[in-house]
């Protein structure tokens, strides 16, 4: 379960940011996670609660924005959102598309304080 190591990294980054800002507690952490990031959101939430114990993030809410897979289709000359991220084919022209524009993100976007 690599979500636990991801959760520990999130807690470390957020705790460091809180200390640098002189903040005692973080109430929410906002993440953007792409559909291709290989992260199970529920497992990350569970792991985050464990990793946050005894830190300024204890009890903080983990808010996850899921990012769909967007690819560039050279035949349509457009960015398109894949309806099935397992099939890298343009939903407009049904041609193969391999240039990923979005969908691999794993970003800490914002921290909220009480």
Swiss-Prot record:
One of its GO terms (molecular function) is zinc ion binding. Zn(2+) binds at residues 73, 76, 90, 93. GO terms for biological process: protein maturation; protein modification process. Keywords: Metal-binding, Nickel, Zinc. Ni(2+) binds at residue 2. InterPro entries: Hydgase_Ni_incorp_HypA/HybF_CS (IPR020538), HypA/HybF (IPR000688). The keyword Zinc applies. It holds the Pfam family HypA. The keyword Zinc applies. Belongs to the HypA/HybF family. Involved in the maturation of [NiFe] hydrogenases. Required for nickel insertion into the metal center of the hydrogenase. This is Hydrogenase maturation factor HypA. The gene is hypA.
């Amino acid at each position: 379960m690599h979500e636990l190591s991801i959760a520990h990294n999130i807690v470390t980054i957020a705790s460091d940011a809180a200390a640098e800002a002189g903040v005692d507690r973080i109430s929410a952490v906002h993440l953007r996670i792409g559909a291709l990031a290989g992260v199970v959101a529920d497992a990350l939430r569970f792991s985050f609660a464990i990793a946050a114990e005894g830190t300024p993030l204890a009890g903080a809410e983990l808010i996850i924005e899921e990012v769909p897979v967007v690819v560039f289709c050279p035949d349509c000359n457009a960015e398109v959102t894949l309806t099935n991220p397992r099939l890298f084919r343009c939903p407009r022209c049904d041609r193969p598309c391999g240039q990923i524009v979005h969908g691999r993100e794993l970003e800490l976007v914002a921290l909220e304080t009480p």
